[in-house]
């Protein structure tokens, strides 16, 4: 008798995309493709075992990309007569994690009297494609008080996962843009201009403080632009900074009529 997950796996039980994410083109969202894996099986012969499981079986991965294990459906079948005593605990494990409490992703207990069972796990985290190819997930099975002779299989387990495969984590849309370029300004952003502009970025401030504690001077301190090299601030914009003929305006979204460079598509 073949073991199958009855019906189709309902992806909506694991992934809730917003309306905006559904209509945006792929370049504006890291979600590239949602896939269901092929079934992987474990035939349990021992009372306690830790077995490798391929949760990405049949999933097409992207080179130098990521895969998110959004959800997992586990189906089990007891290969026993009716009304047998005992039970089993099934636990999904991420073998990369060294602390046991952090490696445990979810567990389930059921009695042997329940001939067939099914449960869902929602790990909902991503790993790199390189890690995924190393088959990082395992299943810990602990059968208790089931009296069967050695060498036989009291329990069969099958696994189907829902995965999100994508190339980049970055989302386009939140950008700084050049609003104007005047005569006499530099043809490119020099290191000094970039350093001073980055002073307004919170993470840059944190990095500067960290480097000062370790005795390393930030390049921002080494090369300040003289006041004669700077253009007068544009008072019409509150959040505008001018650097040698280029003015930057902080903006949450790129206007449709502005010149932008579109990032490389993550299609495959």
From Swiss-Prot:
Q: Where is the composition biased (Polar residues)?
A: 225-237
**UniProt subunit comment:** Binds to host RBCS at the plasmodesmata; this interaction seems required for viral systemic movement. In resistant plants, interacts with host MBP2C at host microtubules; this interaction prevents virus cell to cell movement. In resistant plants, interacts with host resistance (R) protein (e.g. tomato ToMV resistance protein TM-2(2), AC Q71BG9) at the host plasma membrane; this interaction triggers host defense responses leading to programmed cell death.
List the keywords (alphabetical). Answer: Cleavage on pair of basic residues, Host cell junction, Host cytoplasm, Host cytoskeleton, Host-virus interaction, RNA-binding, Transport, Viral movement protein
The UniProt family comment states: Belongs to the tobamovirus movement protein family.
Task: Give a short account of what the protein does.
Answer: Transports viral genome to neighboring plant cells directly through plasmosdesmata, without any budding. The movement protein allows efficient cell to cell propagation, by bypassing the host cell wall barrier. Forms a ribonucleoprotein complex with viral RNA. Binds microtubules and modulates microtubule stability. Can bind double-stranded DNA. Triggers host hypersensitive defense reaction in incompatible plants harboring resistance (R) proteins.
Q: Which InterPro entries match?
A: TMV_movement, Viral_movement
Report the Pfam families cross-referenced here.
MP (PF01107)
The protein's GO terms of the molecular function aspect are:
double-stranded DNA binding; RNA binding
Q: Which GO terms describe its cellular component?
A: host cell cytoplasm; host cell plasmodesma; host cytoskeleton
Look up the domain of life of the source: Viruses
Q: Where is this region: Disordered?
A: 218-246
Protein name as catalogued: Movement protein
Q: Which organism is it from?
A: Tobacco mosaic virus (strain OM) (TMV)
Localization, per the record, is: Host cytoplasm, Host cytoskeleton; Host cell junction, Host plasmodesma
Q: Which GO terms describe its biological process?
A: transport of virus in host, cell to cell
């Amino acid at each position: 008798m073949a073991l199958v997950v009855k019906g189709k796996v309902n992806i909506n039980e694991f992934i809730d995309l917003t309306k905006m994410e559904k209509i945006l083109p792929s370049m504006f969202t890291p979600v590239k493709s949602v896939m269901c894996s092929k079934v992987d099986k474990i035939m349990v012969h021992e009372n306690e075992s830790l077995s490798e499981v391929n949760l990405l079986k049949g999933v097409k991965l992207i080179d130098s990309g990521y895969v998110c294990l959004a959800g997992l459906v586990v189906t089990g079948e007891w290969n026993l007569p009716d009304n047998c005593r005992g039970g089993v605990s099934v636990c999904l494990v991420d073998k990369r994690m060294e602390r046991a409490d952090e490696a445990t992703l979810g567990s389930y207990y059921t009695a042997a009297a329940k001939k067939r069972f099914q449960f869902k796990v929602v790990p909902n985290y991503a790993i790199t494609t390189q890690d995924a190819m190393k088959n990082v997930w395992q299943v810990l099975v602990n059968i208790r008080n089931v009296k069967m002779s050695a060498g036989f299989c009291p329990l069969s387990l099958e696994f189907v996962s829902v995965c999100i495969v994508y190339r980049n984590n970055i989302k386009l849309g939140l950008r700084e843009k050049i609003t104007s370029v005047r005569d006499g300004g530099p043809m490119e952003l020099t290191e000094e201009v970039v350093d001073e502009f980055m002073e307004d970025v919170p993470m840059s401030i944190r990095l500067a403080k960290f480097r000062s504690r370790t005795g390393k001077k930030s390049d921002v301190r080494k090369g300040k632009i003289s006041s004669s090299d700077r253009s007068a601030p544009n008072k019409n914009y509150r959040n505008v900074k001018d650097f040698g003929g280029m003015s930057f305006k902080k903006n949450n979204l790129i206007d449709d009529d502005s010149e932008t460079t579109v990032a490389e598509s993550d299609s495959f």
